[in-house]
Design a protein with these regions (language model features):
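FAD-binding core of FAD-dependent oxidoreductases
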Residues: 182, 186, 325-344, 366-370, ...
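Thiamine diphosphate
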Residues: 308, 330-361, 368-369, 378, ...
Length: 939
C-alpha cells in the first residue's frame, strides 16, 4: 500500500472516520467516539519471515507525515469550521494568599479577550471536575480562596491568533494581572495517603510468612498534620494490628544489632524533574451547540478515559450533549499525558468558544509551569547485614514523597516505589513505608519510573556502601543476596516467571569494565592529570503493568487473505503500532494490511464495567461477574510499560483464535483435497507453524494465507475475532461455547467472532452485535482481589556499568562509556528494544547529573522556567558512540516479552553515583550530582 506524502491526505485517511461508542454509566443520550487512527504501513516495512525491517511508520516520520495532536488546526479537520480561536491560562504564581481576581487593565482595548472564563462561570454553569478526589476539587481558583497549588485562576479566549499572541506576550510575566488578598499561608488539599508493607518470613521458603501484605494486610495510616499515624500494634489481632506488632519486632532487631552485624542508616533525596516530552500538552476542542456534539483533538495517553470523562463533564453541566468525537493524533509523554487534567481544560475552552473551535496549547514556559512532574522523594534506609555470611537480614525504608497540589496518581506512585525498594534482593524481614504529602507544588504523577527510580537508586547506593564497609566486591555482595526464582518479594508474593538477576550479575562481574576497573583507574589517573576515573555498577528490576490491565483487539481476515486489525493501543513513540503488527505476523504469517489504533468504539465487544478494579470488594466482584458482559475495567491507558506483554497478550490471543478456528479447519480441508490424507501426526492447530509468510505443518504443502482465507470463508469458519483480556497479577480465564468447536477455554474474559461468507444462515443470524457473534462466556475465573496486595509479580531486570571521569578542578563529570544488560524476554522488534535502552539510559543520566526543579515559589510554578534554565543531557553527555548493551536470549520459544520502557532508565542513576565514589572517594546521596556539589565535597 502506498503512503501518500501530503499532510492533508494523511489527515483525511487517518483522522476522518469518527464514530460513537456508548458509555454505560452516562446519561442515555450521551456518547463518546474516537477516530480510529488508521495507519497505512510503509511499503516493505516487514519481511517474509515476520521481522520488521524498520518501523511501520518510519517513512511517515522521515518525510514529515507523522502528525502529532499539536499539528492540528480547525481548517485541517474536515467538517470543522475554518475559523480557529485560541486560549491561554493565566496562572497564580502565589499559593499562600487569597485570589482576588484578574486585572486586565494592562491590555489595551483591542487586546482584551473575547471571553474571560473564571471559576464563578464554571460554578454557575455546572462545569465540575470529573473525579475530584483525583484531579482536584476545582479547575479554576474561586475568587476569595487560596490556590490549592501554584496553578490557574483564569482562562482567556481570543477569536484570532494575532490578538491572542500579542496579549499573551504582554502579560506573560506581568505580576499585576493576578490580584491577591490576605496572606493565608499555603492551603493544599489533605495529604494523599500512607501505606506500609511489612514482611517477616516463615520458618522455610515454602512456609507461610509470619506476616506479609499478600497473606495478611497492607497497613494504611492516617495523618495528624504532616505526621503519619499508624494503627495500634496488637500481636494477638490479625490484619494491620498484627503487622504493626511485627514492625515493632523489626525495630527491636535493628536496635539490638551487635558487632556481628553491619548496620547502615542513610538518608537520600531524589529531586523533582520535568519529563520534557517534546510535545507539550495541547488540545483543540469545538463544541457545536446546534448538533450538541463535542469535537476534540487531544494529546493523551488514555483516550478512552478522556472520552468518557469529557462526556461526563459536559452532561452534568448546562451544555447539552449527544456525542463526543475525540480525534487522537500521535503524542509522547513518558507517563505525563496519562490521567492528567489538561485535556479537561481544553474541553472547558471549547465549551466557552461561542461555537468556534478553541485551541489551548502550552508553550514550553507553560508546560514547565503546569506539566506533570516526577515526585521528589526523601528516603531514610536502614540495612542490617550479617558480617560473616554477608546476608541481608533486615531492611527498613521510611519514604516521603511530595505529590503537589492535585492527588492524581501520587499515592499509587508512592506505593509502587515502596514495593520496589527491595531492588534485586531477597529480604527475610522488611518494613517499607511511604507517606505521600500534598503541597502547593506543581502536581506530580505518572512519570517514567513511577516512584521506583527514586527508591531503587537509594537501595543500590546503600548496597555499594555496605560492600565497601564489608571489604567485599560489590557484585559479590549482590550475588549473596540476589532475589531468585521462587523467592517471595517484600509483599509476600512469588514473582511470575524465571528471575535471571544472578545470571546478569555474573555477566557484569566478568565484563572488562568491572574486572579491570582498578588497573584502568590507575592507568587513566596517571595519564590524565586533574581527572579521576571511576567505574560504578547497579542492577534493578522494574515491575510492568498496573495490577489491573485490560486490552481489546479485533482481527478480521477477508476472502482474499487481507488482514485488518483494530486495536485499543495507540502510539506514544516507542513503536507499539509496529510491535503489535509483528505479533500478528508471528502467529498468522502476515502482518495486518490495515490497522487502526487508539480505537474507542467497540460495538462487537458490548461489555459493561464499574471501572473500579482496584477498590471493588471480592463479594461485590463475585456478584458482578455473574453478568457475562461485565469486566473489571475495559481498557488500560498506554502506561506502566504495558504494551509488549499485556496488550501483546490480547493481540496474540485474537490471532490464535483465527488460527485455531479459522486457519486450521481451512488448512485441514486443503491438505485433504482429492481424498488425500493429512499426516497422521498432525493432530490440531498446535502443529501449525509459520515460515516465510506461509502456514506449514510437518512435511505438508506450505499454504498461502490467501488460499486459507478463501477456504475459511467457504467453510463458514471463524474469519474474525475480537478478544478482551484482563490481568490482575494473572490472566482472567473463561470458557465459551463456540459453534463447531464446543466449549473452549481461553485466557481472556470476553470473545466475539465473525463467520465466513459460506456460513449457514443460522450462524450468520448470530452475528448481530457489531457484525460479530458475541459469545457470552459460560464460566469465568477472575484473579482474586487479594492479588492486588502482591504489589507486583512481573519484573524486567536491567544492569548498567558506567565508566566516567571527574574533573577535580571543575567538578564536571564526563561519561566515558556505559554497558547495559537487559532481560526483556523474546524481542518483538530488536531495534525498538535498542531504542528503549539508549533513550532510557540518556534520561537516567539527566536525572543523575543534570536535571533539577525547586518545588515551590522559586520552582516551575512561577512561569519563568524553560530549557534555558533546566539542563537536559545532550548527546555529548551520554557517551553516544561508546555505549554498548547485551540483551539476554529468551529462555525458550514460549518465553514471554517483558515491559522495559521504564527499567531502562533506572540502573544508570545509582551506577553513576557509585562510579563517582570510585573516582573521588566521596558518596553523594542527593540527586543530581552537580559540579557544585562535587567541588564542595572536595574542598
Amino acid at each position: 500500500m502506498s503512503f501518500p506524502i501530503s499532510r492533508r491526505s494523511f489527515l483525511q485517511t487517518g483522522l476522518v472516520a469518527g464514530v460513537s461508542i456508548k458509555i454505560g454509566f452516562m446519561a442515555p443520550r450521551a456518547a463518546a467516539a474516537l477516530v480510529d487512527n488508521g495507519i497505512p504501513p510503509s511499503p516493505g516495512w516487514i519481511d517474509a519471515s515476520g521481522h520488521a525491517r524498520f518501523r511501520l511508520d518510519a517513512i511517515a516520520k522521515v518525510t514529515g507525515q507523522k502528525t502529532f495532536s499539536r499539528d492540528f488546526r480547525a481548517r485541517d479537520i474536515p467538517g470543522w469550521p475554518a475559523t480557529q480561536s485560541h486560549a491561554f491560562l493565566i496562572h497564580a504564581t502565589r499559593a499562600d494568599r487569597r485570589f482576588a481576581g484578574i486585572d486586565l487593565a494592562g491590555l489595551q482595548p483591542d487586546l482584551q479577550p473575547d471571553r474571560l472564563v473564571l471559576a464563578a462561570d464554571l460554578a454557575r454553569d455546572g462545569v465540575r471536575v470529573p473525579q475530584p478526589d483525583f484531579y482536584g476539587d476545582v479547575f479554576l481558583v474561586p475568587q476569595g480562596e487560596t490556590p490549592r497549588l501554584l496553578g490557574q485562576p483564569a482562562l482567556l479566549i481570543y477569536k484570532d491568533f494575532a490578538r491572542y499572541d500579542a496579549a499573551k506576550r504582554k502579560i506573560r510575566l506581568d505580576d499585576s494581572v493576578v490580584r491577591y488578598g490576605a496572606v493565608t499561608g499555603p492551603k493544599p488539599p489533605p495529604h494523599y495517603g500512607a501505606a506500609r508493607y511489612v514482611r517477616v518470613e516463615g520458618p522455610t521458603q515454602d512456609a507461610r510468612d509470619e506476616f506479609s501484605a499478600l497473606e495478611d494486610a497492607v497497613i494504611f495510616g492516617g495523618f495528624a498534620g504532616d505526621k503519619v499515624v499508624w494503627p495500634a500494634a496488637d500481636a494477638r489481632a490479625g490484619g494491620m494490628g498484627k503487622g504493626m506488632a511485627m514492625a515493632a519486632v523489626i525495630d527491636e532487631e535493628i536496635a539490638s544489632a551487635g558487632d556481628d552485624a553491619l548496620m547502615l542508616k542513610r538518608d537520600y533525596f531524589s529531586q523533582s524533574i520535568d519529563a520534557s516530552a517534546m510535545e507539550a500538552d495541547n488540545g483543540n476542542v469545538w463544541y457545536d451547540p446546534a448538533a450538541q456534539v463535542l469535537h476534540a483533538v487531544l494529546a493523551t495517553q488514555s483516550p478512552h478515559e478522556v472520552a468518557t470523562n469529557a462526556a461526563a463533564l459536559v452532561t452534568q453541566s448546562k451544555f447539552s450533549l449527544k456525542a463526543v468525537d475525540l480525534k487522537a493524533g500521535y503524542t509522547v509523554g513518558y507517563g505525563t499525558k496519562d490521567k492528567v487534567i489538561f485535556p479537561y481544560f481544553c474541553v472547558i475552552a471549547g465549551l466557552y468558544g461561542d461555537g468556534l473551535p478553541v485551541r489551548l496549547a502550552n508553550d514550553r514556559f507553560e508546560q514547565f509551569q503546569m506539566g506533570m512532574k516526577r515526585h521528589a522523594f526523601w528516603i531514610k534506609d536502614t540495612l542490617v547485614v550479617d558480617r560473616k555470611t554477608h546476608r541481608f537480614s533486615v531492611m527498613k525504608a521510611e519514604l516521603k514523597a511530595d505529590g503537589g497540589g492535585r492527588a492524581n496518581l501520587s499515592f499509587a506512585v508512592g506505593i509502587v516505589g515502596t514495593t520496589a525498594a527491595q531492588s534485586i534482593y531477597y529480604l527475610p524481614k522488611s518494613d517499607l513505608s511511604i507517606a505521600v504529602l500534598a503541597s502547593r507544588a506543581v502536581e506530580a504523577g505518572s512519570t517514567r519510573g513511577f516512584g521506583t527510580l527514586q527508591t531503587m537508586a537509594a537501595t543500590e547506593m546503600l548496597v555499594d556502601e555496605a560492600a565497601a564497609a564489608l571489604e567485599t566486591d560489590a557484585i559479590d555482595l549482590r550475588l549473596a543476596n540476589v532475589f531468585r526464582s521462587g523467592m517471595k518479594n517484600t509483599q509476600g508474593a512469588v514473582p511470575a516467571g524465571a528471575l535471571r538477576n544472578d545470571e546478569m550479575l555474573r555477566k557484569a562481574k566478568t565484563h572488562p569494565l568491572w574486572a579491570g576497573r582498578e588497573t584502568r583507574k590507575a592507568n587513566y589517573d596517571a595519564t590524565h592529570p586533574g581527572r579521576s576515573y571511576g567505574v560504578g555498577f547497579a542492577q534493578v528490576q522494574k515491575n510492568y503493568g498496573s495490577g489491573a490491565e485490560a486490552a481489546v483487539v479485533t482481527l478480521e481476515l477477508d476472502r482474499d487473505g487481507r488482514l485488518t486489525m483494530r486495536h485499543a493501543a495507540h502510539e506514544m513513540g516507542p513503536g507499539v503500532t509496529t510491535s503489535q503488527a509483528v505479533i500478528v505476523a508471528r502467529v498468522l504469517g502476515r502482518a495486518p494490511d490495515r490497522m487502526s489504533y487508539g480505537v474507542v468504539e467497540w460495538p462487537e465487544m458490548p461489555l459493561t464495567s464499574t471501572e473500579l478494579p482496584f477498590t471493588t470488594s471480592q463479594a461485590t466482584e463475585d456478584e458482578l461477574q455473574r453478568n457475562p458482559r461485565w469486566t473489571p475495567t475495559f481498557v488500560s491507558p498506554m502506561a506502566t510499560s504495558n504494551s509488549a506483554y499485556y496488550f501483546g497478550h490480547a493481540t496474540r490471543e485474537a490471532a490464535l483464535v483465527l488460527l485455531r478456528y479459522g486457519i486450521w479447519p481451512a488448512a485441514r480441508a486443503l491438505w485433504m483435497r482429492g481424498g488425500g490424507k493429512i499426516a497422521p501426526n498432525m493432530n490440531g492447530p498446535e502443529d501449525l507453524r509459520v515460515a516465510k509468510g506461509k502456514i506449514i505443518a510437518g512435511d505438508l504443502e506450505p499454504l498461502q494465507l490467501s488460499a486459507l482465507a478463501a477456504k475459511a470463508h467457504e467453510l463458514g469458519a471463524v474469519t474474525g475475532a475480537c478478544v478482551h483480556a484482563f490481568n490482575r497479577r494473572e490472566w482472567a480465564e473463561a470458557e465459551f461455547d463456540l459453534p463447531g468447536a464446543g466449549r473452549v477455554g481461553l485466557p481472556v474474559d470476553a470473545l466475539a467472532v465473525k463467520y465466513g461468507d459460506g456460513a449457514a444462515p443460522a450462524l450468520k443470524a448470530l452475528m448481530r452485535v457489531g457484525g460479530f457473534h458475541f459469545i457470552e462466556r459460560a464460566t469465568v475465573r477472575y484473579p482474586p482481589v487479594q492479588r492486588l496486595n502482591a504489589g507486583v509479580t512481573r519484573y524486567a531486570p536491567m544492569a548498567t556499568l558506567v565508566e566516567l571521569a571527574v574533573n577535580i578542578a571543575t567538578g564536571e563529570v564526563e561519561l566515558l562509556s556505559h554497558h547495559s544488560l537487559l532481560d526483556c524476554g523474546p524481542q518483538i522488534v530488536p531495534s525498538l528494544v535498542s531504542g528503549q535502552i539508549q533513550g532510557g539510559v540518556a534520561m537516567g543520566i539527566g536525572h543523575a547529573l543534570h536535571e533539577f526543579l525547586p518545588l515551590y515559589e522559586d520552582g516551575p510554578g512561577d512561569g519563568t522556567w524553560n530549557w534555558n534554565r533546566y539542563q537536559l543531557p545532550r548527546a555529548s553527555d551520554v557517551a553516544t558512540w561508546t555505549q554498548t548493551a547485551e540483551v539476554l536470549q529468551p529462555l525458550s520459544d514460549s518465553d514471554t516479552p517483558k515491559g522495559i520502557a521504564e527499567v531502562t532508565m533506572i540502573a544508570v542513576v545509582p551506577a553513576i553515583a557509585n562510579a563517582v565514589h570510585h573516582a573521588i572517594g566521596k558518596r553523594f546521596n542527593e540527586f543530581p550530582i552537580t559540579p557544585e556539589k562535587i567541588r564542595s565535597a572536595l574542598s
